[in-house]
């Protein structure tokens, strides 16, 4: 398949992804914050992820600066990644729908915050993070570019491994034994195998 066609496919998926986040994110942002945990370095990590999930992929699409890092992956692998991305956007939409107004881009507890344990959250505590792992991997494969793939994965891994323990600590503080019990029944990124 023509390289420009892959770029168009990626842009279509990217626009849908941004649209879903905008629709649900705007609704969720209307809820006021009750408690925020914002370590100083987290802004830097979020910015690093912006570079990995937005800036570099769009640079790969709209310029030739990263062309020397192209991988030349077979179309079959890129097509598989595109299908996974399409399904992953469906997952992303479901995650946002299940979370409702409880979603936040930062670590915070909102007024009226509820512990969501229904829908996809019945079996997985952090499906949004599972989605983002898939996103950074598949965008690098679709665009067939080492920089997009590796930078996206590394930037996301750093944020993920620093943020998740702090997020779970915040949720234990807010929901106590209910969250601890929930942790025992669910997996972080995948359903728990008993």
Curated annotation (Swiss-Prot):
It comes from the Archaea. Keywords: Cell membrane, Membrane, Methyltransferase, S-adenosyl-L-methionine, Transferase, Transmembrane, Transmembrane helix. Residues 1, 63-73, 145 are extracellular. Its EC number is 2.1.1.100. The chain crosses the membrane at residues 2-28, 38-62, 74-98, 126-144, 146-166. It is found in: Cell membrane. GO terms for cellular component: plasma membrane. Substrate binds at residue 163. GO terms for biological process: methylation. Its main location: membrane. The keyword DNA damage does not apply. It is a multi-pass membrane protein. Pfam families: ICMT (PF04140). It is an enzyme of class 2 (transferase). PANTHER family: PROTEIN-S ISOPRENYLCYSTEINE O-METHYLTRANSFERASE, PROTEIN-S-ISOPRENYLCYSTEINE O-METHYLTRANSFERASE. Carboxyl methyltransferase with activity toward prenyl lipids. In vitro, displays activity toward N-acetyl-S-farnesyl-L-cysteine (AFC) and S-farnesylthioacetic acid (FTA), an analog of AFC. This is Protein-S-isoprenylcysteine O-methyltransferase.
